[in-house]
Amino acid sequence: MNALTRDLVNLVNTAEENQTAKEQTSGTQFREKLHLMPPVGWLNDPNGLCQMDGVFHAFFQYSPFNAEGGVKMWGHYTSTNLIDWEYKGVSLYPDQPFDCHGVYSGSAFLEDGTMYLYYTGNVKLEDGDFDYINTGREANTVLVTTKDGIHFGSKKELLRNSDYPSDLTCHVRDPKVWKKDDTYYMIQGARTKNDVGQALIFESSDKINWHFRSRIESEKPFGYMWECPDYFETDGIKILSSSVQGLEGKEWADRNVYQSGYFLVDGDILDSYKLSPYHLWDYGFDYYAPQSFEAEDGRRIHISWMGMPDCEEYTNPTIKDGWQHCFTFPREVFIKDGKVCQKPVRELDAKKQQLQNVQNELTQSGCPVYEVNVDGIKENHFQAVLSDELILDYENGRFQMHFTTKSKTSVSAGRSLRYAEVGTLENVKILADTSSVEVFVNDGEFVFSTRYYPNDYKIVVHSPSAHITFDKIQ
């Protein structure tokens, strides 16, 4: 441990201890039960998601010194059931010349009992006239390994700016690694000097020495940056996920600042391929930078940052409590009738206690953490009102999530309206936590996620002839 690492360890420990003492004394109103949060400060992208020897690992972008962001390091949680998580502290600090301005996002690759963590080491040069897009930034690809997810070896710098194609800006980041046959592949997000987003493929025979292989591009320019790329196959469907910055036009005018979605891949992504139109993973307010991994039982598990970068429209009142943001609840990605769908991981079933099983209408108060299922919806009639201010409803093929008040001091904290054209409405699942709501429409073909900040907890559901259940989450 070098002197910088030692000092960072002490500073982080002090910040976390002070936050714990503060919350023990005064409490915190909106801490979640099901969703991972930072102990103190700021959380953003999920990193290094994996399951090794029965234990799930979730690393996260962590800025413990400021609830509105700052220098990034990797915090670390573990779990055996994807619900009850144990905080393991900071695993990776920005303590080397090649990552001194942030241990940025990356992924985990497992092989032969070893966890290989690949990430982007961020360096911002000083004392120069830099725009930090084309000049002044280093985006270094770094590797660190561990046998147990707790004790880590030395960092290795694998790729520098000079190893990337010359027509790119300094924005190359977020490595994700997989293996096919005897070759290892790495995908990274990139921005060209012409402000076109794309993904890069690198290949290696040993997980250490990497060489540029090819690009992944849409037929027409699509945004200026593809962040947090992820490639996987599930049920025979090939999926390229990316968080895209810079989408403009009428189609995106009512959406978030940046989008997170996926392309279906026809062909071989390493050779000849065609990308489908872009589909959003989530149509709500708070969703960005998703990553996935394959669990030991073969399920594809998907987790996202339940937040939105560079958003001035809305905020989170937990900032005054010394922390901000959380992850989405882990989701299973599956294919139904050729469509990509999502649902909460099945481990949640063991935590449910059914309180109501009714027809037509449901009212429940005083329970902040719950799941509501509405099945057998007839003639598309559906409305749910949460804490009097968050409304979910359907009309003429459009499903909406909207708040009655947009004020930053209200339940919405500034959020207004999000929607999707869903066609016929068949069923709705609502998963609510202390300060978040995730809504799964038509078996999870469409999903809406939002933070919300009620003083009292109540839900009223109206759907004539539908079957409605309310389960308290223990």
Regions found by a protein language model. Give the residues of each.
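Beta-rich accessory regions
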Residues: E16-K22, Y258-Q474
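Catalytic nucleophile loop of clan PA
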Residues: A108, Y231, S292
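Repeated scaffold domains used in trafficking and secretory/extracellular systems
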Residues: W226-P229, Y288-P290
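Beta-rich carbohydrate-recognition and catalytic domains
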Residues: M1-D174, K179-F222, D235-Y283, M306-L355, ...
